[in-house]
């Protein structure tokens, strides 16, 4: 399936810049270099963890309090997994993949230099993915996320995911 982007909106939001998503339809968060220019290419995602919202919704058995508790537990697990990935990358030497870390595919580090400075400050990202929002809302409310009640719940769920990432 092709990825569709809105070049018109991107140009408006990012000072005329348009950029593609990564292979999994994941976009890097905006990041500017020391001169204030957006940098999209050469950056990377340290890892992604996907939360299965359909499973969270079904596990709650239509109990909203139980749902929010399960969701928070799963989000905590996702955060732990992402931070384990982040910590495991610390200390990685540029020598493990010179084409990436030394010759410019991602950076131009010296031989023997760690990639640590690329792991902080937004140059690279950690991502929380999700799947099954429709099924989650349907299992909790018995209605689609396209109904007024369903839309309200779907937005609250997305806000909770966003809050977990901030």
Description of each model-found segment:
Residues 126-139, 159:
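Contiguous, well-ordered alpha-helical segments that form the cores/surfaces of helical PPI scaffolds
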Residues 1-122, 139, 143-166:
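Conserved catalytic cores of very large enzyme subunits
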